[in-house]
A protein has these predicted regions:
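Signature of the catalytic double-stranded beta-helix
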Residues: 26-39
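N-terminal secretory/targeting leader peptides
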Residues: 1-24, 41-191
Length: 191
């Protein structure tokens, strides 16, 4: 996670888009001379055929009081689900394990001072109602990888493999366009 944060209204500013994050991850996984072979080796050992990464959600930090940098978050009770805690602890934050379903109440009651969630959760759960500030980290979160069982992949003909690969590429292209050009502007208006 990048240490740079930006105000919520600058969601698409300075090249911070969901598609850019996915492009970087796919480069690391599929093209970079140092990392790609290691990741491919790991996938083979796990018995999976990776297609690539799919769009994730922006990580938004919702705070009960003003915050404009990651430094501003230090010393505050920082709510995050358990699976993301180690990343924020490594950044020197005072992590309080809190599931997303409990975020609104935890923020409202002061159990946590800040909470990190995907922008879709911040929007749908109206976490911004509890906040004096919302920061969007300059990285996406919740990004997953699209993969298939390697044995099943090997059973497919070359033509079938090509169809799966093209379908993945078309889907990611559609997702990136929809996320960057439809969903983010809609969230900006709501939040």
């Amino acid at each position: 996670i990048a240490s740079q944060v930006m105000p919520l209204w600058q969601i698409g500013a300075n090249g911070h888009t969901a598609s850019k994050g996915v492009d970087i991850l796919n480069y690391i996984a599929n093209e970079d001379e140092k990392t790609s072979p290691l990741l491919q080796e790991e996938a083979t050992a796990a018995g999976v055929h990776p297609f690539g990464y799919n769009i994730g959600d922006y990580n938004v930090v919702v705070c009960r009081s003003e915050a404009s940098t990651m430094e501003d978050l230090k010393g505050r009770a920082f709510g995050i689900p358990a699976q993301g805690a180690a990343v924020y602890e490594a950044m020197g934050l005072n992590v309080v394990t809190c599931e997303t379903a409990d975020a609104y109440e935890s923020l409202s009651r002061g159990v946590v001072d800040c909470f990190a969630a995907g922008i879709s959760s911040v929007s749908s759960m109206k976490l911004y109602e509890t906040a004096k500030s919302c920061l969007v980290l300059s990285a996406t979160g919740g990004t997953g990888i699209c993969m298939m069982n390697e044995a099943s992949w090997e059973k497919l003909s070359e033509e079938q493999q090509k169809i799966f690969t093209e379908a993945y590429n078309e889907t990611i292209s559609w997702m990136k366009d929809r996320y960057d050009n439809e969903l983010l502007p809609a969230y900006e208006k709501e939040i």
